[in-house]
Each structure stands twice: as C-alpha cells, then as structure tokens.
Amino acid sequence: FTKSKARAGPRLPGARLKTEVIREINTYYLGAKSVNPDVDIDIVWVNTWYDPGKEAQAADVMIAEGCDMVAQHTDSPAPLQTAEKAGVLGFGQASDQYKFAPKAQLTATIDNWSPYYISKVQGVIDGTWKTGDYFGHMNEDVVQMAPFTNMPANVKAFAQKIKDGIKNGKYFAFTGPIKDNTGKLQLKDGEIADDGHLNSMMYYVEGIDAKVPGQ
C-alpha cells in the first residue's frame, strides 16, 4: 500500500529505550522493504507508552510530512484514529483497534496473556512452577493478529501466508544476511537470530536512516 519512496511510519514507541521497541522497528521496516525495496521509514519517539494526545500529534505531523502508512509501539488507538481522519492506513498495537478506526486498520498485534497465566497457575497447582524469563510465540497464541481488513484479497492471502509461516516456524524476519545501518554484518547468510541476539538488539538494520537514541 505504501507508495514508492514514500515514508512508511511513524513509529510511536514507548517510555524507555528498549530492545523490544528497536526490534519491532526493524521488523516493520524489513517487512515493508520485502514488498517495496524503495520504502522509507521515519521514527518519532514520544517517550510514553500511553498518551493519546502525544500519539495523535506525532501521527499528525508525520502524515503532514508525507507518511502514507502509520504504525506504532504505543497502546492507544489515537494514531489510527488520526490516520483514519487523514485517509491513511495503519496498524494497531497490543489490541484489536478496529472499532476505533474501521477504515484505517489493516491489522493489529494482540497481546493475549491468558495462555501464560493459565500455564503458570497450573504450575503452582502442580508444584512445578519456576522463576525465569518467558518468551511467548504466535504458535502459543500469546501473540495474535487481528483480522486482515481494508486490503484486497491477494494482499490478504499473502499476509495470511506470512502469518502461517511465523506460526509454524518456517518464516523468520531476522534471517541473515542482515547488516546494521553502519554496514556491520549482524547476521551471516542463513543465520537466524536467537533469543540472545533479539534481546540485545540495539541497532537499526541497513536502510533505516536514523540513529538509535544515545548512540
């Protein structure tokens, strides 16, 4: 949907500089670039997880500067609502925001904590519960996708294919070769980023014309 050489953004990340946010910016860009090699991305840090006013203002500015696609790492539907008013498409974050912007949302990531809580409570009941880090995946339904909307059938089919590939482990966005935007090789040809790499990712991939804050 994004036009050649148009901006695809903005990113509207959260309160602290986190690998989670950097990783999602990179994923968004790699996905967009896979279907449009000329895509550009602009990044705006609003320094909050939830502030509808700031989120809407950032989206407004970016759209005025030429963004034709909006994505976010904040939690309110304000960016999508702003996009809808401007006739721009975008993606929701953390929950299905379709009811707030039915003409703008293409899909949204959905955080579904139920499987995690059920397994942990069951572990307490069984006496098998242990502390530790947890990394949930789409095949556990901890991360879900909202229905694909406002897109033609062929695009919907392509999106479903990618979603299925992620769930069954056949598609992984961070598969080398991948360089960062300084030209340093981060993943060799065919190498798949492991959890350690993903959770220490503090670089933008090649093609993103921006600096990670503080670097």
Residue ranges, per PLM feature:
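A residue-level marker of the well-folded mature domains of exported/periplasmic proteins
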Residues: 1-215
